[in-house]
Amino acid sequence: MKYRLSDISTIISGGTPKKKVKEYWNGSIPWITIKDFNAKKTNSFTNYISEKGLNNSSANLTKENDILISSRGTVGKLLMVKSGMAFNQSIYDIRTDTKKVNSDYLYYWLYKNIEEIKQKVHGSVFDTITRETFDLIEIALPDLSVQSEISSKIKVIDEKIEANQQINDNLVV
């Protein structure tokens, strides 16, 4: 069955606390920008915000297995979230409806189809993914059990690639 991406997920916008208010920054909540998208999964952050910064801005928190996508500037970078973090307004959080789609399956599908997705962006000066873009992205989904089976197989291969990359990185040093 075919679905629009917006029908199988909740699209959540990010935000930035006011930089001038010092008590909004250097807290315990990781705050991610596109610059922090250095791998498929990230555990390193350059900025942290406080609870007060989160509550007094349009920033939102991710949940485990959410998918982040860069929406401005460098459009289409993807990140699978493994823990809660806040994010800026140049990123959308795709929170899947787990009754319809497996998060890993959707992540791999987006990764494979990112060039096609980039063709749906808007903007006169800069390419931008907007909320409307998610209505234009259609995905044919197999049953959840098939999605899980496919994503499990890809994940094993992906983990081997990451392990080999780590070995290569260590050899360079």
Which sequence ranges carry the predicted segments?
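Non-catalytic DNA-recognition/assembly elements of restriction-modification systems
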Residues: 1-15, 39, 136-173
